[in-house]
Design a protein with these regions (language model features):
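N-terminus-centered regions that define maturation/targeting leaders and the start
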Residues: 1-126
C-alpha cells in the first residue's frame, strides 16, 4: 500500500501546524493499493526516537476498508488513547533533537490478520 500526505513528503519535516507548537491537528493522509480482501484498516503514528523506545501519537482502528483518505483534522474509525493520555491525535512534541514519526497503515482481513501495510515517515524537531 502507498501511504502519503499532501502536507509533507516521506522522510521530510512535518509542518509545525500538525505539532504541539502549532494547531496540533492531524495531517491529511491518503492511500492507494488496499488489498481486495481487506475488511478494515488501522493507523498508528509512533515516535520511534522517544526516550522509552516509542511513543504513540495516534491510534485509529476500525477504519472502513473503502476509506482512501483522512482529511486534515478528520476523524474516521475508532480513535484510541495516545501517549499523552488523551483520545485521538496528539502532535509531535519531542523533548529535544529531531525525532522520526512513523505513520503505519495496516490492511486487515476478516480474521484481523495483516494483509497489507503502508508507511510514511515524518521528521520534527522543536
Amino acid at each position: 500500500m502507498n501511504l502519503t500526505s499532501p502536507a509533507f513528503g516521506n522522510n521530510q519535516s512535518i509542518p509545525a501546524k500538525y505539532t504541539c507548537t502549532g494547531q496540533n491537528v492531524s495531517p491529511p493522509l491518503q492511500w492507494t493499493g488496499v488489498p481486495p480482501h481487506t475488511t478494515t484498516l488501522s493507523l498508528m503514528v509512533d515516535d520511534t526516537d522517544a526516550p522509552g523506545g516509542h511513543f504513540t501519537h495516534w491510534d485509529v482502528t476500525q477504519i472502513p476498508a473503502a476509506t482512501t483518505s483522512i482529511p486534515e483534522g478528520g476523524h474516521v474509525g475508532v480513535e484510541g488513547t495516545n501517549g499523552f493520555g488523551k483520545q485521538g491525535y496528539g502532535g509531535p512534541c519531542p523533548p529535544s533533537g529531531e525525532h522520526r514519526y512513523v505513520f503505519t497503515l495496516k490492511a486487515l482481513d476478516e480474521n484481523g490478520r495483516e494483509v497489507g501495510r503502508g508507511e510514511l515517515i515524518a521528521k520534527y524537531a522543536k
